[in-house]
A protein has these predicted regions:
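Acidic, surface-exposed loops and disordered segments
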Residues: 1-243
């Protein structure tokens, strides 16, 4: 498949055939993830494949996964990981202050996200489906306990990968001109927002499954109605970060 066509046809898969991925295919996925760009080559991530049925069930419950975690061909947790760098600094009797700050944490988040998306693109190129699972952050303390995460790590999201048992319709993105800026930032006009709301209202009303009375603004108002996952700051402090 043409790469652009593949990217433009992306949808999240939430129903998987129960076939597990072969060791060879899983190794290819990991190699693909590692090939992504990394800031200063710090490679500030770890990828944990969760196979234990009890752990999968616990993650499914806290993430509200409805089957697309435990039924996937493989389930990975992508961890922003500065612990390995703390090991190096400690081994060489160097202070950890530069590792604990916001910039280092952002680097680890970016590195981890690039690795995950590179895996996702490769997975879809060989006919697999994927679904990012941000719901693992619903209980960061529980995730850290389940995965025995050390200091200077953060479980960023999960990634379910497997053989699709069904495919959702592609959601219309914002028009390119709404996200492309030249030389300076340009806020969206009310007309641009209204036009996209109408596009999304038509999409939600007309899709073949789970039709809804919704548009983009309604979705965003619901999403940002109140602060979410407010334990994140406390968890970051527990993990040794100092912002």
């Amino acid at each position: 498949m043409d790469l652009l066509k593949q990217l433009l046809s992306h949808t999240s898969v939430r129903k998987f055939a129960k076939d597990k991925l072969s060791p060879r295919l899983k190794n290819q996925l990991l190699c693909a993830a590692q090939s992504g760009s990394s800031s200063n080559f710090v490679q500030a991530y770890s990828i944990i494949e969760v196979t234990d049925p009890q752990k999968l069930a616990a993650i499914e419950k806290l993430a509200n996964g409805f089957g697309y975690i435990k039924d996937a061909g493989a389930f990975y947790v992508f961890v922003a990981d500065l612990n390995k760098h703390a090991q190096i600094l400690t081994q060489h009797q160097q202070p950890l202050e530069a590792l604990k700050n916001e910039e280092s944490f952002i680097v680890s988040v970016v590195d981890t996200t690039i690795a995950a998306q590179t895996m996702a693109v490769y997975a879809e190129s060989v006919g697999l489906g994927i679904c990012y699972i941000g719901g693992i952050r619903n209980d960061l303390f529980k995730m850290a306990e389940l995965l025995e995460l050390p200091e200077y790590t953060f479980p960023l999201f999960g990634l379910s990968v497997g053989y699709p048992a069904g495919k959702n319709e592609v959601k219309p993105r914002l028009p390119v001109e709404d996200i492309q800026h030249t030389d300076s930032y340009q806020p969206l006009s009310s007309q641009q927002i209204d036009a996209y709301d109408q596009l999304m209202e038509d999409y939600y009303a007309g899709r073949t499954t789970n039709a809804a009375d919704a548009d983009w603004s309604k979705k965003m108002l619901a999403h940002f109605h109140e602060p979410r996952r407010t334990h994140t700051t406390e968890f970051l402090k527990k993990q040794g970060f100092e912002f």
